[in-house]
């Protein structure tokens, strides 16, 4: 079985259980989930459409946000071929695990590294009909309001790093109706 790990880090060779908080190394059997992980930023706008992790949409909360963030972003998808008996699932029997995620209690040495252009990879998935971009006027108003409230609360309670604040100032100032200044 192939297991994937998506990240922005270009220099991974392995993952050690001793460096993980709970001694578990989580990988996914779903390449698209690994791609979503490689695309992570300070705001997660990838929405799993059917709770089966086979189709995603991206909530484009500001005009051209997806393109602005990901146009030249590079990610890496690492993989290994491994015995299914070496991996476990947190989900109860008969329930599909979140993001097709499985864990091992053994160190992992990757056998393959794939450098991907995040934007181009998602456009390929869009052509196949398993990825879409939902424009702001089609996003539920409650989602936009809740997102705005969440990030404003995070900022107002000093839970944002300087890098997060700079990210929001650069890409999403319209969503939050304010220009944050790092204190």
Which residues are covered by each model-predicted region?
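Short, conserved phosphate/pyrophosphate- and ester-handling motifs at nucleotide-, phospho-/glycolipid
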Residues: 30
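Conserved NAD+-utilizing ADP-ribose enzyme module
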Residues: 35, 40-183
């Amino acid at each position: 079985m192939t297991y994937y790990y998506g990240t922005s880090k270009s220099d991974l060779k392995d993952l050690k259980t001793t460096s993980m908080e709970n001694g578990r190394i989580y990988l996914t059997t779903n390449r698209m989930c690994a791609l979503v992980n490689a695309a992570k930023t300070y705001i997660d706008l990838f929405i799993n459409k059917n709770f089966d992790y086979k189709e995603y949409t991206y909530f484009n909360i500001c005009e051209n946000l997806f393109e602005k963030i990901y146009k030249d972003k590079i990610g890496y998808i690492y993989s290994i071929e491994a015995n299914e008996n070496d991996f476990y699932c947190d989900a109860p029997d008969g329930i599909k695990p979140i993001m097709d995620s499985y864990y091992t209690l053994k160190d992992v040495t990757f056998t393959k590294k794939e450098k991907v252009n995040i934007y181009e990879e998602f456009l390929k998935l869009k052509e196949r009909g398993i990825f879409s971009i939902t424009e702001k006027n089609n996003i539920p108003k409650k989602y936009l309001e809740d997102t705005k409230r969440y990030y404003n609360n995070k900022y107002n309670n000093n839970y944002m790093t300087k890098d997060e604040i700079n990210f929001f100032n650069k890409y999403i100032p319209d969503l939050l109706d304010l220009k944050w200044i790092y204190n």
